[in-house]
Amino acid sequence: MAAIDVRNLSVGYGQNVLLQNLNFSVNEGEIFVILGGSGCGKSSLLKNLFGLYEPLAGNVLIEGQDITDAHGEDRQKIMTHFGVMYQQGALFGSMNLLENVTLFMEEYTTLDREQMNLLARCKLDLVGLLPYEQYMPSEISGGMQKRAAIARAMALDPKILFLDEPSAGLDPITSADLDRTILDLSQNLGITFVIVSHELASIYSIANRVIMLDKASKGIIAEGDPKVLRDQSPDPRVHQFFNRIMSKEVP
């Protein structure tokens, strides 16, 4: 069974259709990256996949359960299957790292405070931040904040993590450290990652498979191993995209 199955999905706002009739799946344990130029609907697609936005049409199945038709308790159960890290990380500045990680445990679990703290420390340890549990977000680096946000996204032991531009704003060395964290979590815990990114080094080093979205056609123009697509795709739009990434000129 696929971790995520997307069927005839159309994404947009009101009469503004960004993407239409998308069909693809994400395998369990896979690092799956969504590519495309600015304005093509990458982040909007991601938010449709985890249910923040409702699609214009079509369905998204997570672990075989249709999130687009789920409501109430059924929807809450599905939501415990995944975690989300937004582009800015969005840690709460008035809480230390331990408190940030336990935040959603308070709402979605029946654990007592001691149990929540123990579980949160395990998550911080997985991303190399256990010694910093009492630090405030403002007291740690941007890369550490991103790793803390991933720890918080793992608070409910999800099988899937959705990450929106996790390397945004990071220097190459810090970005590579974050990539290693993602790879470790995928390989050691079997977590499925769905990532929006345009960082070429990250894409090549961690992605098992990518899809490339196109603004003009409102669809998927390529799918597969990113290096194979770069070297062998017959579609000139694919080569143009990779060339623009290399020159940091993604439109």
Residue map of PLM features:
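A short, proline-enriched helix->beta-strand linker immediately N-terminal to the Walker B motif
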Residues: 155-159
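Conserved ABC ATPase signature
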Residues: 136-140, 144
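Helix-to-loop junction immediately C-terminal to a conserved catalytic motif
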Residues: 50
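Conserved beta-strand-loop-alpha-helix hinge in the C-terminal portion
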Residues: 216-241
